[in-house]
A protein has these predicted regions:
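Short, internal strand/loop/helix patches
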Residues: 103-128
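Conserved segment of the thioredoxin-like fold in thiol-based oxidoreductases
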Residues: 78-112
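Typically the conserved alpha-helix immediately C-terminal to a functionally engaged Cys/Sec
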Residues: 65-81, 91, 144-145
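Non-catalytic, surface beta->alpha helical segment in thiol-disulfide oxidoreductase systems
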Residues: 120, 124-126, 130-161
Length: 161
């Protein structure tokens, strides 16, 4: 009887941070965003993500899990506009408007990026969500774990949970 909830609603291990590489406290090379090799395919970020604390979400406009993450981020940003969230988006220009219409995440600054620069940042897992402190990856989370409280706690104490 105790196992019934897990049988009826199994944990999706393919989308939990348990499957993210546990490596943290390493510098994320953001330089390609500011000096992209494929400059025609990458919009330079509107803020300097290399300095200060940021929650960086790397999303695809066509990925359903990325849309869930964007919707959660919209609510987090709506509840606390001071949280420094930034999106790096991948997809064709025609997909941007439907993404924003669906997620209503137009309250979050973003840049579009494609090609090698995007692949280098995202790898093969989307959405990719990092807590960054001066370009150092302090924590990686998946969209299931997005928590306004945890982000605010990290911003205030410097300790990521």
């Amino acid at each position: 009887a105790i196992a019934v909830p897990f049988i009826v609603n199994p944990v999706e291990y393919s989308y939990t941070s348990n499957n993210l590489s546990e490596a943290i406290n390493y510098p994320l090379d953001l330089e390609p965003l500011y000096n992209p090799v494929d400059s025609g395919k990458c919009e330079i970020p509107k803020v300097d993500l290399r300095r200060g604390k940021h929650v960086l979400a790397i999303l695809s406009l066509s990925c359903s899990h990325c849309r869930v993450a964007a919707k959660k981020f919209r609510l987090i940003k709506q509840n606390n506009p001071g949280i420094p969230i930034y999106f790096i988006l991948n997809g064709d220009t025609a997909s941007y408007r439907p993404f924003i219409t669906d997620t209503k995440a137009n309250n979050i600054p973003s840049s579009q990026c494609a090609g090698r620069t995007f692949i280098k940042l995202a790898s093969m897992q989307l959405p990719r969500i990092y807590y960054l402190d001066n370009s150092i990856v302090v924590k990686k989370v998946d969209y299931f774990e997005l928590s306004q409280y945890n982000i605010e706690d990290w911003l205030n104490t410097g300790k990521a949970k």
